[in-house]
């Protein structure tokens, strides 16, 4: 069996930043306890379980305000996906200590929304309903933000102003966003469009579109709640023409998928620990369809290898530099 190790894959800088911020919090004796994360720090249960092992507890729910109702004391960490101003205000009113791990790329989009609101624009935001990033985007300016996910959502819009700004969730498929932006342009010809697919998401999608071509299947390692993971599987099917299966870890890999395969492509979502991908690759490298002793799939639960290994004392400055870079037109 030939294994195509699609590159780049796995952790992006926004995920690493958020995890380092949370790890640093666990090491800070001055922070009020308990320490909770408002939702999943990144969409991967292996990561949230690893943080729980060092006293950083995930509290999840339908939306950020509902989750916050469950937290009464201590410190709360806002996840990489971002939160609305009302959630931040509510946390402050409850007397909670807060730490913001929002990805700089997401913050940049939220800042754009605020700028366009101040300039008198209606904002069409392309995103996945129920995902925390669009929840935060909508909550940034609820009077002017209109969340759309499909062409039917766009058809249902009734905007009287010609001042329309269009942007999107950072982890969407760039092709889906382009298609919806084209559709919006037909209905609102004067709309200003600003695609906000983050570079880490974009290069991972492009890698799958090119490198998965010709494979018998693509295995995408990532949590079922990870939107960017789902988009990688979609890209494999729609752009590379290769069927794809998403697995949370090696234990979910079905032998039926691979026993007759000659070429298997492997990639991973931006919130997937390297350890989980390595287990899949090691399994495939030793797999022999004719030898059932090679079929055993076991995940080694090693939280220490999932969590970041060191504090980064320059994290805040690097995040400021990233935000400034994006504001100046960088990608």
From Swiss-Prot:
Residues annotated to bind dimethylallyl diphosphate: 43, 81, 131, 226, 228, 271
Top EC class, one word: oxidoreductase
Pfam families reported for this sequence: LYTB (PF02401)
Residue positions of the active site: 133
Phosphoprotein recorded as keyword: no
Keywords assigned: 4Fe-4S, Iron, Iron-sulfur, Isoprene biosynthesis, Metal-binding, Oxidoreductase
This protein's pathway: Isoprenoid biosynthesis; dimethylallyl diphosphate biosynthesis; dimethylallyl diphosphate from (2E)-4-hydroxy-3-methylbutenyl diphosphate: step 1/1; Isoprenoid biosynthesis; isopentenyl diphosphate biosynthesis via DXP pathway; isopentenyl diphosphate from 1-deoxy-D-xylulose 5-phosphate: step 6/6
Residues holding [4Fe-4S] cluster: 12, 103, 198
Cofactor dependency: [4Fe-4S] cluster
EC number: 1.17.7.4
Family, as annotated: Belongs to the IspH family.
Function: Catalyzes the conversion of 1-hydroxy-2-methyl-2-(E)-butenyl 4-diphosphate (HMBPP) into a mixture of isopentenyl diphosphate (IPP) and dimethylallyl diphosphate (DMAPP). Acts in the terminal step of the DOXP/MEP pathway for isoprenoid precursor biosynthesis.
Name listed for the protein in its UniProt record: 4-hydroxy-3-methylbut-2-enyl diphosphate reductase
Organism encoding this protein: Listeria monocytogenes serotype 4b (strain CLIP80459)
Gene name as annotated: ispH
């Amino acid at each position: 069996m030939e294994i195509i190790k699609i590159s780049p894959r796995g952790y992006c800088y926004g995920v690493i930043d958020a995890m380092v911020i949370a790890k640093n919090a666990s090491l800070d004796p001055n922070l009020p306890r308990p320490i909770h994360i408002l939702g999943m720090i990144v969409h991967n249960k292996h990561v949230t379980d690893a943080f729980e092992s060092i006293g950083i507890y995930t509290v999840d729910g339908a939306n950020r305000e509902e989750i916050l109702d469950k937290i009464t004391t201590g410190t709360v960490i806002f996840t990489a996906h971002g939160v609305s101003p009302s959630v931040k205000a509510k946390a402050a009113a409850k007397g909670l200590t807060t730490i913001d791990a929002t990805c700089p790329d997401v913050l940049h989009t939220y800042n754009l929304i605020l700028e366009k609101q101040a300039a008198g624009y209606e904002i069409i935001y392309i995103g996945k309903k129920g995902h925390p990033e669009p929840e935060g985007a909508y909550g940034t300016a609820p009077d002017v933000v209109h969340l759309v996910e499909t062409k039917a959502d766009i058809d249902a819009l009734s905007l009287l102003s010609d001042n329309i700004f269009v942007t999107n969730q950072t982890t969407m498929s760039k092709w889906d966003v382009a298609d919806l932006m084209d559709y919006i342009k037909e209905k609102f010809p004067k709309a200003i469009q600003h695609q906000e697919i983050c570079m880490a998401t974009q290069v991972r999608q492009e890698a799958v579109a090119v490198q998965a071509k010709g494979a018998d299947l693509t295995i995408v390692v990532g949590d079922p709640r990870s939107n960017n993971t789902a988009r990688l599987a979609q890209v494999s099917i729609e752009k590379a023409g290769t069927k794809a299966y998403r697995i949370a870890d090696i234990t979910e890999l079905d032998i039926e998928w691979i026993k007759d395969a000659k070429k298997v492509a492997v990639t991973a979502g931006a919130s997937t620990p390297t350890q989980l991908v390595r287990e899949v690759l090691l399994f495939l490298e030793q797999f022999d369809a004719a030898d059932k002793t090679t079929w055993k799939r076991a995940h080694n639960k090693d939280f220490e290898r999932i969590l970041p290994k060191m504090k980064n004392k320059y994290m805040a400055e690097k995040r400021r530099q990233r935000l400034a870079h994006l504001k100046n037109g960088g990608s």
